[in-house]
Amino acid sequence: MIKILITEFIDAQALQNINKEFEVIYKKDAWQNKDYLEKEIEQFDGVIVRNKTSLDKNILINASNLKFIGRLGVGLDNIDTEYCKNNDIIVQPATGMNADSVAEYVVNTSLTLLKKTIIINEETQKGKWPRTSIVTKELKGKILGLIGFGDISKKVLNLVNVFDVTCIAYDPFITSKQMEAENVKKVSFDEILNLANIISIHVPLNNETKYLFGRQVFIKMKKQP
């Protein structure tokens, strides 16, 4: 039977389902023990990780029987994908599985910031009712800038349409025609910084995107949404 190591927390129902098909070793804290991974990974056919487990070359070089790595999420920056590619180890992220949840989070956070919900809640708990001292803003009429135009950005787009929001996007891999089909205008990175009231980032972490947002980028942004 195929033997799988799970190195981080996983939902009980999901674990039960996996146990029906495979021999599973569930060690939710294994991600913290690099020595364990280096010594024990050779006995497994597959590994399931989240974002905390680092599977670098020093660990993978010991994985003589490893055939696949399942990533519960979409980011692959914690896995040496180049080593996996060169050694016929399949790496499978859960692409799109959390798109709805992330999109809802983006809209919720945008509304929370514009409506200053946290500040008002804190004041209310103190027995105050800041009806005039705290000024809030509407999402309606704002310009939303999307960095990356994949599954999650499209989900965000669907949710904000009801707020009469204008959406612009930057993605070097998506054409203007493709964006126009979604009623989105393709713009440059700098244009998003200058135009957008809200910026939402949906790109993988890699050498090209690491440090994409630094001090000089924040300086270029609008100071008020």
Predicted regions located by residue number:
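Short, flexible loop segments at the rims of nucleotide/cofactor-binding pockets, characterized by
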Residues: F22-D29, G46-I48, E123, T175-E182, ...
